[in-house]
Amino acid sequence: MPYYNKKEYPKQIWVSQIPEREVSLLRENLAGIKQTTFVLMKKEEDFHQLSEKRSRDIIFLSSNQSLLDLARDVDVPAIAYQKPETDTFLHADMVVEGFEEVDMTFLQRVYERHFNIPWTILETERCIVRELELSDLDDLFSMYAEPGMTDYMEGLYEYEEELEYQKAYIENMYRFYGYGTVSYTHLR
């Protein structure tokens, strides 16, 4: 089962001010994805509808910084298209120079990172491997309390300090490196 079927995902992809060649590549990469609607915005005014929509249903792609800023203001995940060899730098959840490799899994990952949803790395009938989230902290402390757990590695900080450390780690490292500390859950 594809990754994007597992959790929340963007139900609409809004696109504005992206070259037609790049839009064609994106459509090609998303061919066969039935659960997501592709919305090609013709006018900037169309974007103001976002404030009336449920932002968790949308991911926005644009090369216009003022529209990307509007997306941020209404809590919509956004991908900036940065034209290659351009001197200006756009700000968004993710910046791309082309859509050759942008597929639904990529969009899903940007969407999840925006809404702080931990990535599922692997799922089988017997286990799930996903990024650590703050709700795992109690289990982490239980695991580290086992005999021999810290014989060859550092232990955890005190609970509140570890909580702050993990918050900062998730906020900064997950976004910067594209992955984070993983958690393994045995299902059977």
What name fits each language-model region?
Residues 7-20:
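Asp-based phosphoryl-transfer active-site loop
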Residues 25, 128, 133-151:
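Short amphipathic alpha-helix that is part of the acyltransferase structural core
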Residues 44-66:
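Conserved Lys-Pro-Asp/Glu-containing loop-to-beta segment of HAD-superfamily phosphomonoesterases
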Residues 88-104:
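Structural recognition of alpha->loop->beta junctions
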Residues 148-170, 177-179:
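Conserved GNAT-fold acetyl-CoA-binding loop/helix
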Residues 185-186:
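Conserved small/polar residues in nucleotide/adenosyl-binding loops
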